[in-house]
């Protein structure tokens, strides 16, 4: 519950959104703006949504080199990315894309590399693992690693995820690292 008199400040300064695909970007933006209008009775543009690949945007500074060369990566979007990167984040909620183990090249859903995140996975989850190492470069592990590195102290991470990390041998290092990095873990 958030009192109405605090909503404007939260909306303008504390709620942020990232999306890599253009249609979900617009849908998220519309949903956020519509909810704000429903709660307050007035429309206000939501200025804290960015069109960006979260996993390419590491180091929390300008890094657009690996972003797709697309017409909508405007100066305004770049400014929004910089603004988000400078913010202290205490809650991250996400639904990482799933594209591990595609059946063939024609699925057009390749697992691309993310050097900065993949290095962090190697330094943490893989370093602590006794299992096959390549499975830890899936999108779930990447987003969890990014979130763990990005979150502020006393922060919360909530993801929609499969359950492979609970018992799979390939996630033994992940489980060790997460147990060390977090004081509480809830799996629903």
Question: What does each model-found stretch correspond to?
Answer:
Residues 1-187:
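SAM-dependent methyltransferase catalytic region
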